[in-house]
C-alpha cells in the first residue's frame, strides 16, 4: 500500500466466509512472500471490510488462510486507528476484563457479550516487511484480540459460554445467511 493512499480504494470486494466455513475454523499460515500479491490482498481486505461496514477483517474471512488482518477501528476515546498487520502475534492482553457486545462480519447481524481484556499489544509486519507494533485500548483492544483469534481458527462465539453461547448459536441457526453451515447449539 502506498504511503498516504486511502486503503481499499483500489481493492475489490470479495465474498465473506460465514460461520461454519472450514477456513474460519483452522489456523492460518504464516505469510512468506511480501510481494505485490500481498499488497493486493490487503487492498481487497480493506475494500471488503468497508463494504460490509466492519471495523476489522482477517484474511480467512475472505477465504484466504494467511496470517493477515486489517482494521479501521476507534478506541474508547474515539481516536481512529487504521492499518494492517502481517503475521501478527498478540504479545500482551491485559488490564481489566470487560464483557461487551461483540459481532463479526462472518456472523452478520448477530452479537453476544464477550469477555476481552481492555488492553492489547500486537506485533507483526507491514506488507513491505517492516516491523510494526500496535497498542490498543478499549474497543480497539477488543478488535485486535478478535482478529488474532480469527487467524488462530477461532470466532468470538468460541469465547462465549452458557446461555449466551446457546442464544447466539440458535440465532445463527435461524439467520437468513445460514445455509446449514452453523454448528448445532451446545
Curated annotation (Swiss-Prot):
One GO process term, biological-process aspect: co-translational protein modification
Pfam families: Pep_deformylase (PF01327)
Protein name, as recorded: Peptide deformylase 2
InterPro entries: Peptide_deformylase, Peptide_deformylase_sf
GO molecular function: metal ion binding; peptide deformylase activity
Function: Removes the formyl group from the N-terminal Met of newly synthesized proteins. Requires at least a dipeptide for an efficient rate of reaction. N-terminal L-methionine is a prerequisite for activity but the enzyme has broad specificity at other positions.
Cofactor note (record): Binds 1 Fe(2+) ion.
